[in-house]
Amino acid sequence: MPTILVINPNSSTFITTSMEEKLVPLVPSDVKLRFLTCPQPGAAVIDSITEATLTAALVFQALTPSVLDGVDAIAVACYSPTPLVDMIRESFALPCMGIVQASVLSALSVGQRIGILTSTYRSECLLYELLDSFGVSRTRVAAIASTGRTVLQLSQMPSQERETLLVQKAQELANTKGADVICLGGAALAAIRDQIQVAVGPNIPIIDGVHAAVELLAGLARQNLHTSKFGIYTYP
């Protein structure tokens, strides 16, 4: 029975709760989930390189032996570039995956041209760089669409207004940009995955990166695979 630690690298417990409520009914019964939220004084949301770096340090310090006891793999639920994934891979043998990588790996397996729905234009720019670092050709990326609002601003919008905005952006990715698979850029966006699926139709897969990461990591754990300790991830 693989045990996956799902890390919310910001300090907003409502996001952790939302992830837990969404994930638990979806994962197989033989997969156990644990959750960790960034300790205070971590940022409430991550919308910048600085916030990603500072929260990574706080979360890393919280990964004590007691927290990691019995854990088989770690998912980092941040849809922005964060040093936390590489920090964990370098310091532990446990498989670790960020939700950007998980969603893109899944998308490349079921579609030809990826669309990503994200929060701000800054996130859009950072994601293009991150995809380049994964070796994903720009020809496989239909577009990255931003809402023009931070994660915190999105969370504070009336639910119907937020849903309308996100659905509209997803439809643009599919109908205007030619995306044949869409990744939801953040744990907060996954709450309306079903509504987006209805809006774009059944032929276009909608990928929740957190769910994708848990499923991929459970598979790695079942294969008894660990992070390579030869090369870049040699122990410090």
UniProtKB/Swiss-Prot annotation:
Alphabetically, the GO molecular function entries are: amino-acid racemase activity
Any one GO cellular component localisation term in the record: cytoplasm
Q: Which UniProt keywords apply?
A: Cytoplasm
Q: Does the keyword Cytoplasm apply?
A: yes
- Where's it found, cell-wise? Cytoplasm
Superkingdom is Eukaryota
Q: What is its main location?
A: cytoplasm
Gene3D superfamilies membership: 3.40.50.12500
Keyword Cytoplasm set for record: yes
Q: Which InterPro entries match?
A: Asp/Glu/hydantoin_racemase (IPR015942), Hydantoin_racemase-like (IPR052186), Iso_Racemase_Enz_sf (IPR053714)
What is the similarity comment for this entry? Belongs to the HyuE racemase family.
> How is this protein named in the record?
Uncharacterized protein C576.02
